[in-house]
Swiss-Prot record:
It comes from Staphylococcus aureus (strain NCTC 8325 / PS 47). The keyword S-adenosyl-L-methionine does not apply. Its EC number is 2.7.1.-. The keyword DNA repair does not apply. It catalyses: N(6)-(D-ribulosyl)-L-lysine + ATP = N(6)-(3-O-phospho-D-ribulosyl)-L-lysine + ADP + H(+); N(6)-(D-erythrulosyl)-L-lysine + ATP = N(6)-(3-O-phospho-D-erythrulosyl)-L-lysine + ADP + H(+); N(6)-D-ribulosyl-L-lysyl-[protein] + ATP = N(6)-(3-O-phospho-D-ribulosyl)-L-lysyl-[protein] + ADP + H(+); N(6)-(D-erythrulosyl)-L-lysyl-[protein] + ATP = N(6)-(3-O-phospho-D-erythrulosyl)-L-lysyl-[protein] + ADP + H(+). This is Probable ketoamine kinase SAOUHSC_02908. ATP binds at residues 86-88. It comes from the Bacteria. Keywords: ATP-binding, Kinase, Nucleotide-binding, Transferase.
């Protein structure tokens, strides 16, 4: 990290800066000053607005009493966007039961006007999504997310006409199921995989790196099931505090498909079979 670049940050008396691994979108650093330790994210060649949605999400988490990093500052230096947050010290272990309770607490926050979406778009390193407010979840999830992913996969040569035929069948099935399901606009993390939570040194769970959205809470829960990191204690505690509706086990596959399509777009052919398997499951399984 260039010292001249660091001089533009609103942090005084920086003693040490060291890279932090784990993400695939941002450069991440631990920054120590004379008085405190901070977490710095940098997105090269992007405007300050790149972090606007994440900042808004973290602020909503704070208002909801969700343990998460607190925003300190954001801005732009030499054409690079940055975000400074409090640094959360990770502990050795924690309670999956408490994590389930925390996510249930997050999802209990409802959009006051009953709208689905968010005040800002999702901006990722490889794709962006329109979050304009909608009256129904299906428009946000299917029209704005899945259809956009389908178009991008086709445009980038990762899907062909045969894939689109299968997708169109899957799409009809998803729409039919969501029209029967009563969705409520809960505050979502938006990217709740195992790498976006941690246990602090006192054992408390914390959430970070949100892609905020008001939507059906099954979206978050479905994403938790793709790559692991969540135990049966997590799901038992979540369902005890905020039980999922009948048929959730089938609908969760919709959100697994979404995440796998995102990964196919980001990482290529290695996820092609996983996406195909997920679409087959949606077509073959029945609501339980």
């Amino acid at each position: 990290m260039n010292e001249q670049w660091l001089e533009h940050l609103p942090l005084k008396d920086i003693k040490e800066i060291s890279p932090v691994s784990g993400g695939d979108v941002n450069e991440a650093y631990r920054v120590e000053t004379d008085t405190d330790t901070f977490f710095l994210l940098v997105q090269r060649g992007r405007k300050e607005s790149f972090y606007a949605a994440e900042i808004a999400g973290l602020n909503e988490f704070e208002r909801a009493g969700i343990t998460a990093p607190r925003v300190i500052a954001s801005g732009e230096v030499n054409g690079d966007a940055y975000l400074v947050m409090t640094y959360l010290e990770e502990g050795a272990s924690g309670s999956q039961r408490q994590l389930g309770q925390l996510v249930a607490q997050l999802h209990s926050q409802q959009q006051e006007e009953g709208k689905f979406g968010f005040s800002l778009p999702y901006e990722g390193g490889d794709i962006s999504f329109d979050n304009h407010w909608q009256d129904d979840w299906c428009t946000i999830f299917v029209d704005k997310r899945l259809d956009h992913l389908k178009d991008e996969l086709l445009n980038r040569g990762l899907w062909d006409a045969n894939d689109i035929k299968v997708y169109d069948k899957v799409r009809r099935q998803i729409v039919a199921e969501l029209e029967k399901h009563q969705s409520k606009p809960s505050l979502l993390h938006g990217d709740l995989w195992g790498g976006n939570y941690m246990f602090l040194q006192d054992g408390r769970p914390a959430l970070f790196d949100p892609a905020p959205l008001y939507g059906d809470r099954e979206f978050d829960i479905g994403i938790t099931t793709v790559f692991g990191g969540f135990t049966s204690e997590f799901y038992d505690a979540y369902n005890k505090h905020y039980p999922l509706a009948k048929g959730a086990s089938y609908r969760l596959e919709f959100y697994r498909l979404y995440l796998l399509m995102v990964h196919l777009l980001k990482f290529g052919e290695m996820y092609r079979d996983s996406v195909a398997h997920s679409m087959d499951k949606i077509l073959q399984d029945t609501t339980s």
